[in-house]
Amino acid sequence: MVHVIKGVIEAEQGAIEYYSRIIEETDGIDPVTQDMVIAILRDEQGHKRLFEGFLREYEKEGLA
């Protein structure tokens, strides 16, 4: 299970980096797309924090 959680965290980090690049590239060019991607980025950051919490719980319980 820990392997899956770490994989999700890694995938979320990749998505965060990808969306951050889109935000930079659309700055001053396409505010509608930028606003949409900012909202998506917030979701991805929340997902990452959630799974980091799951990982901490597994580690605390000695399941990691």
Spans of model-derived segments:
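Iron-associated oxidoreductase/ferritin-like identity signal
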Residues: 1-64
